Amino acid sequence: MRTPVILVAGQDHTDEVTGALLRRTGTVVVEHRFDGHVVRRMTATLSRGELITTEDALEFAHGCVSCTIRDDLLVLLRRLHRRDNVGRIVVHLAPWLEPQPICWAIDHVRVCVGHGYPDGPAALDVRVAAVVTCVDCVRWLPQSLGEDELPDGRTVAQVTVGQAEFADLLVLTHPEPVAVAVLRRLAPRARITGGVDRVELALAHLDDNSRRGRTDTPHTPLLAGLPPLAADGEVAIVEFSARRPFHPQRLHAAVDLLLDGVVRTRGRLWLANRPDQVMWLESAGGGLRVASAGKWLAAMAASEVAYVDLERRLFADLMWVYPFGDRHTAMTVLVCGADPTDIVNALNAALLSDDEMASPQRWQSYVDPFGDWHDDPCHEMPDAAGEFSAHRNSGESR
């Protein structure tokens, strides 16, 4: 049986949550911190009511902080699994760490532990049981609507939105109605509780469809978890869909409306000048990025389609329209202050006109202001600042 792992993320009150979880017999808390000079790993457990702690300084792997933390954590998870007195592992994340890439690494990054351990990911021995994110609502909402940047180039909103969105349990302090309305739509699969007293109870009653470390892809449903679709004051989910492509320059101008009064935008885009590529747009607060998400099925050879997820193929069959196949745009925009009508009108105006649709031979000549996007070389692990990176654009980042 695999050992359950709980990740605790957030900006505030994570110490209280890990302290509450530590009280259960058999729980080990693991924490990594980089002080600018040394990576330190700390573990804590309770034995007959006595707190037992250890602290170790780690040797840098390849001179890289991120590699050091990743390699040590993944190996440590597998070793802790073998200990008879360990029934649960709690990973206490640094404040600006995002849980999604860590869960991905647990499931996919191959590690070599040593004699007696088969090579493979940590998921051979452990499973992500839950992600707990601590949210101080008074601070969280302004951070998640803002455009402040961290030293590593990510925006504050990218982290705070990502931490909350990926949670199975949201632990709130200073809850207020607007922030709660946003969180219910941002993380509809998560349970919400106030304070730390009921954390264990909430973890025991997670929804059956909770993430538990599973990552959405650009091709999964955008409204997974059935968020509330009715507006709650200035908070609402705006849905936009289209079966004709965007003009890249007009879309580039329109996305400015997604950077003010918007918490989160996610969506698949069909750009006229990139007929083969699914473009993925994602925003958090005042930051936005676009990246390629592979080919449309209509642009694939039969041998490529055979390897595509069955759910995506079935969805494509339902919406297939000659001559464009499964090409489409589908977006969801979580607004908190922005005018939904303005957003929909701007996106509609960015679509090709009837005259432009009649001249597909011209589409490839459209100027593309979005630039060349690529994966950061260490996209699944923290960079030198000790944080995790995602897709990053060398030319266009808003």
Curated annotation (Swiss-Prot):
Role description: Zinc chaperone that directly transfers zinc cofactor to target proteins, thereby activating them. Zinc is transferred from the CXCC motif in the GTPase domain to the zinc binding site in target proteins in a process requiring GTP hydrolysis.
Binding site for GTP: G10, Q11, D12, H13, T14, C67, T68, I69, R70, D71
EC number of the protein: 3.6.5.-
Presence of keyword Nucleotide-binding: yes
Tree of life domain: Bacteria
Pfam families cross-referenced by the UniProt entry: cobW (PF02492), CobW_C (PF07683)
A GO MF term: hydrolase activity
SMART domains associated with the record: CobW_C
Family: Belongs to the SIMIBI class G3E GTPase family. ZNG1 subfamily.
Record motif CXCC motif, residues: 64-67
Keyword Nucleotide-binding: yes
Recorded catalytic activity of this chain's protein: GTP + H2O = GDP + phosphate + H(+)
Domain annotation CobW C-terminal: ranges: 235-351
Cross-referenced PANTHER family: COBW DOMAIN-CONTAINING PROTEIN DDB_G0274527, ZINC-REGULATED GTPASE METALLOPROTEIN ACTIVATOR 1
Keywords: Chaperone, GTP-binding, Hydrolase, Nucleotide-binding
Protein name stated in the entry: Zinc chaperone Rv0106
